[in-house]
Amino acid sequence: FEAGRSNGYSYWESGLFALSGSLIWECCMENTRPSTNDLVNTTLGGMTRGEISHRLAVMILDDTASGSSRFWRELAGAIVNPVGALSRLARGDMTRDFPNPDERFPGSFAVSGDLGYRHVGGSAVRPDQWTLSLSALYGDPFAGDIHKPFDTFWIGADLNTPGGVVSRIEERGILRGWELTDASDAVRHVVGFSQEYEYLNNEAQVVGAQAFSAGILSKYRIGKLAAATDFTVLAIPLAGIKTTDFANPQTGRSYDYAPGGGVRAEARLYAGAREIAAAGYGIIWTRTVDGASRNNRLEFFRGEIRVPVTGVLGVGGSYSWYSRKTTYPGFFESQRTQNEWRAFVNVAFGASRRTGSGSPETPSTR
């Protein structure tokens, strides 16, 4: 994907690079039959993750810089977007002085981090952990960032220790949206289509999935506060879901491949531009096409509260619940669940190129 994107091709055109690269590899460079899973995940995952990497790297790079500033920016950009760095090296852009692109920065950009303690209920192997949650929001659909793919996107990740380091990665970008109201209205609505990547790894769910979604984003003025909601329908071309604790002798895997769909609802409350409360619920149904199970039902609930303390600092707590119900031909397994709570210190930074911008951004799953 980046081979195309970093050389001037559009989002959709670069997606053909990812598809053709995967197809050539699957059909001509392996001694096994082409894998549908590899085609889907390489193409769609390459598009989602590639576009986010491309836009973040463009923000980091400065084509007018020189000296140590230029070196460190080029190095950071290469870490975020290695293929884009190879393209810049081949063109001589790493050392050339020329104007930055007009769309180097989005209209707004925000970064948030939660550092604290996590307790996992039930029979978790490591119930008590340090945890770090990171999220970034690029663009604002209520400021018109809805016309090109990923003009607005959101990313989030959870890192924990001791134990498995990564327990969550979520990436979500609006492909195209339409404003249904005027900018001056007290209640505003944006409808749109998005592309997503989801990865969860906990006691109840080990899931990786590419997804498309359609929904309505709404923003409400409530006195000095503001609220935002997101109601979404999900379509999942293919998900990988761990359904057994052992390798299936027929597939050699402990996870199954399954397409599916679902719904998600979220709400957030803001004081100024700072989120102070959030809650979300989602449910997904999948039908196994390759694996030991017959179907799966995955659910989640998350709730968070943050209290600003001073400046960029705040404190907060959260509760999460995850569930997986898997059915199998020939035997029964009970529903698996995990609940957890967190206490943390929050640090939030934001910047906007729009005068007077302080409105809440897109609600997104945390």
Q: In which residue ranges do the predicted regions lie?
A:
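Transmembrane beta-strands of outer-membrane beta-barrel pores
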Residues: 115-121, 159-163, 195-201, 233-239, ...
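Detector for outer-membrane/organellar transmembrane beta-barrel domains
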Residues: 110, 205-288
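Extracellular loop and loop/strand-boundary signature of outer-membrane beta-barrel proteins
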Residues: 121, 199-203, 247-254, 287-292, ...
